[in-house]
Amino acid sequence: AKQTKYIYDILGGDDGRKLYDAVQKGIDKAKALGADVIIGLGHLGVDPSSSPWTSEEVIANTTGFDAFIDGHSHTVMENKQVYDAAGKAVTLTQTGSYLANVGKMTLAEDGTITTELISTADVSDAAVAATAATWIKEVDEMLGEQIAVTDINFYISDPATGKRRIRSGETNLG
C-alpha cells in the first residue's frame, strides 16, 4: 500500500483536488437550491503543514463562497481576504483557541461581509461563572481517580524509530 501523509481520507487526494471538487459540488448545489449567500464552515486551518487541504487553498481552488469560518489551526484571524479561483475576495475568519474570542460575522444589505472577534476576557456572567465553578470543582475531585490499569505502554511515536505514528499508521492502541 502506498504510504501517504495520513491514513484517513478527507476526500483530499494527494493534491487536494478531490476535496476542492467535492466542496465545489456543494457550493453549486446550494446555489441551485436558491442560496443567496454561501458561507463555508470548515475545520481545515491555514497551517502550511496541512497543505494542500487548508481553507485558503480550498477557497483559491473553488468559486462561490462569500465567506469561510475556519478552525483547526487556532489562528486569530479577522476579515482576511482570500481570492477564489475567479478572483473574487472571500472573507476568511477564525477565532483562535480556548474560547479567547467569540466571532461575529455581519452581512450588510449591500452584500459586504465583515467579521469581528470579541474578546471573552472582559465578559463575565455571574450565573455562568457559578455554574462553571461548580462543574470544575466536580471534575477536579474526579481527577486522579484510577479507572483502569494496564501493563502495556501506549505509544504516540514508534519506540524504535521515534517517528510519530498517530494519524500516519497503526499504533498499539488501534
Descriptions of predicted regions:
Residues 1-46, 85-174:
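Acidic/His-rich catalytic or pseudo-catalytic neighborhoods
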Residues 47-51:
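Beta-propeller domains
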Residues 53-106:
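Conserved beta-sheet core of the metallophosphoesterase superfamily
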